[in-house]
From Swiss-Prot:
Its EC number is 4.2.1.20. The keyword NADP does not apply. It is an enzyme of class 4 (lyase). It holds the Pfam family Trp_syntA. It catalyses: (1S,2R)-1-C-(indol-3-yl)glycerol 3-phosphate + L-serine = D-glyceraldehyde 3-phosphate + L-tryptophan + H2O. The keyword Ribonucleoprotein does not apply. Pathway: Amino-acid biosynthesis; L-tryptophan biosynthesis; L-tryptophan from chorismate: step 5/5. It comes from Aeropyrum pernix (strain ATCC 700893 / DSM 11879 / JCM 9820 / NBRC 100138 / K1). One of its GO terms (molecular function) is tryptophan synthase activity. This is Tryptophan synthase alpha chain. Disulfide bonds: none annotated. The active site is at residues 37, 48. GO terms for cellular component: cytosol. Keywords: Amino-acid biosynthesis, Aromatic amino acid biosynthesis, Lyase, Tryptophan biosynthesis.
Amino acid sequence: MAIARPGFSVYLTIAWPSPDTFLEIASTLKGCVDYLELGIPTPKPLYDGPTIRLTHLKAVESGYSGPKTLSLAEEASQEAGVPYIVMAYATEQPWSFSEVLREASRKGALSVLPPDLPFELPGHVEWYVEESRRLGMEPSLFASPKFPHRWLDRYRRLDPLLIYLGLQPATGVKLPLAFLRNVKTARKIVGQVYMLAGFSIKSPEDALRVLEAGADAVVVGSEVARLVSSGRLGEARHLACSIRAAISERGG
C-alpha cells in the first residue's frame, strides 16, 4: 500500500458545498493530485481552521455527516482517479469511531486519519493502529509542532502509512516562520516514515519550501475551499495543478 513520494494531496470536506459539486471538484482535480484527503463532516471540527470548519458545518446543516457519507468519498476517489484517505474525528461526533473504520475499509479507503486521537484519547493510539490493520487499512497519525519528541518516536515505531505534520494548531491560518525548523526536526526523529505536511500552504513556492525541509508530501485544503466557495473552481484546479507540477519537476 504505497502513496506517491514526493506527493501532493488536496483536502475536501465530503458533500460540501453539495454532493454534486463535491464530485465535480474531485473530477476537476483529476491529473492534479496523487491522492485525496476526504473529511467526514462533523458538528465540532475542533482541529480545523475557520475556513474548513465552515465547510463541515454547512455539510452537516444540509444533512450530511457520519460514516454514511463515505459512499460519496469512494465515488470522489473514482472521479479523481486516485486513492483516498479519510479524515475523521475520533471523539467529536455522535457515531462510533469503530463504525467509521469499518465503513472506510468497506469503501476502499487507504487509511483513516483521526486528528484528535493523540490529544483526546492518547491511550487508544495502539488500538487504532491494530484495528486499522485488522480491517485491511494502514494507520495515519497526526502530529503538531509542539509534540514531544518521544511521541514522534513512538509514531515512528508504529510504522504508519504516514505521519501528518500540522504546521499550525489549526488549519488555514498564516504560515509560521518556524515551519522549516518544525519539518526538519520531525524528519530527524521519524526517519524514513512518510511525512505529509499541511496547513497554510497556498502556492507552489510554499509547497517546495516544505518539501526541501524534509516532508515527503504536502496537502492543501483551506485555499482550495476559499476558491471553490467564491465560485472559482477553475482557479482551484490551476492551483492544484501548479503545485503538483512543481513537485513533479523537483522530483524525489
